[in-house]
Design a protein with these regions (language model features):
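Catalytic domains of carbohydrate-active enzymes, especially glycoside hydrolases
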Residues: 41-57
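Active-site mouth loops of central-metabolism enzymes
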Residues: 22-41, 92-94, 144-154
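Conserved, mostly hydrophobic/aromatic
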Residues: 20, 46, 50, 96, ...
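Short, well-ordered coil/turn segments that N-cap beta-strands
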Residues: 11-16, 51-52, 87-91, 110-112, ...
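Alpha-helix-loop-beta-strand connector modules within alpha/beta enzyme cores
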Residues: 65-95, 104, 128-138, 142, ...
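Glycine-rich beta-to-alpha transition loops that act as phosphate-gripper elements at the mouths
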Residues: 20-21, 93-101, 119-120
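Conserved anion-binding
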Residues: 24-26, 61-65, 109, 117-161
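N-terminal amphipathic alpha-helix/helix-capping segment at the start of soluble metabolic enzymes
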Residues: 1-24
Length: 161
């Protein structure tokens, strides 16, 4: 599978996705990488440590107490960072978003992959936007309520939908 200008083998190899949250309220690193220069230094460090893809996210999706952003607010966070990373490094860029408008803006800015934590279930335009772009996507499982009877069966059923 081609992501950006790199070929990724889909069998028998593990890849490392480094996370660059440009949010003030991320549960893991809130606010650390909002500054462009600090963020680029962090990307440089992650590349040196073996990162294969950088995943840029502009809205916290922690399990509790995060702020939902408008498309415009999220775009204002991620697009400048996508452009800065693209201009400074030869590394595939993943955009972590579940909103089609943000995905469109990120694709125009140079994102190479869309990482949708809602597995195309939040925004009914997302599949169309990704398909039209020709980019690969990473689909994840998520639920608003963690009401699992049999976790593995429930996750498999959700992903099959």
């Amino acid at each position: 599978m081609k992501i950006g200008n790199r070929e990724f083998q889909t069998k028998g190899h593990t890849y490392v996705m480094g996370i660059l949250n440009v949010t003030p309220d991320s549960f893991s690193d809130g606010g650390k990488w909002n500054d462009r220069d600090r963020a680029l230094k962090h990307v440089e460090e992650m590349i040196a440590e073996g990162m294969d893809i950088v995943d840029i996210g502009g809205e916290s999706t922690r399990p509790w107490g995060y702020t939902l952003l408008s498309d415009e607010e999220e775009i204002a966070r991620v697009v400048p960072m996508i452009e800065a990373v693209k201009a400074n490094f030869d590394i595939p860029i993943s955009l972590d978003t579940y909103k089609s408008g943000v995905a469109e803006a990120g694709i125009l800015a140079g994102a190479d992959l869309i990482n949708d934590i809602w597995g195309l279930k939040y925004d009914n335009r997302m599949a169309e936007v990704i398909a039209k772009s020709g980019l690969p996507c990473c689909l994840m499982h998520n639920r608003k309520e963690a009401d699992y009877r049999d976790f593995m069966q429930d996750v498999a059923a959700d992903l099959a939908d």
